[in-house]
Amino acid sequence: LYPTLLVKGAPLAANPGDWVPYDTEIAANVVADLKEMVPPWVRIQRIQRDIPKHQIIAGVMNSNLRQYARRELKRRGKRCACINCREVWRARIDPADAELRTRSYEASGGTEHFVSFEAGRKLLAYMRLRDDEQATVRELKVTGQAARLGAEGSGVQHHGLGAQLMGIAEEMSNDFGRLRVTHGVGTLEYYRKLGYELDGSYVVKGL
C-alpha cells in the first residue's frame, strides 16, 4: 500500500493542479480502513515506499506508517487479518493446537483454495491450491523461523505441517489425476522426498 509521495523531478511537482497530499494521520486512517477490509488469504507485503526523506517534497514523511495504521486499528478495537499480521514468527504456539481451515474463492477463471493451519488468529502454515484446467499448488509456507532440511527441533517448521498440507492438496486434486507445484530451487529436494518429480517449470506427482 503506497500513498502517493511527491518526489523531486516528478512531473506532478511542476503541475500539481488540485492534488493535495495525505499527511501521516490521514494516510494512517486510509491504510487502517484498507487493513480492516483485507481477507485472510491476502498478504500486505509493504506499506509506504522506502524513499529517502530528503527526496520527498510532499506526502507522508514517516517511514513507519504501518505502525501508525496498527495504532489506529487498535484504537478502533479492530485487527488486520492479512497474512503478514498473523504469521507466527517468534510466538510460542504449540502446533498440536492448530486447526485446519479451508477458504475457497473464484479468481481469474479458476477456483483458489487457501488451506491453512491456525491457532486462534495466528497463522502457522498455509497453502494456495488453484483449480482450473489443472491442479496447481502455487505457494506452500510454514511460518516461523526457517528450518534446515533434515534438521530436528521443536519449532513450528519441524512438525510436518507442510507435508500435511501437501497431502490435503493431493486429496483435493485427486480428480485431476496429477498435481503440479510451483517451487524454488532450494525446495526441490523437499518435494522429491514427497514423491514429486521435476517436469519443466514445475514438480509433478501422479495421483
State each model region's role:
Residues 44, 137, 184:
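Conserved, mostly hydrophobic/aromatic
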Residues 153-172:
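Conserved acetyl-CoA-binding loop-helix of GNAT-fold acetyltransferases
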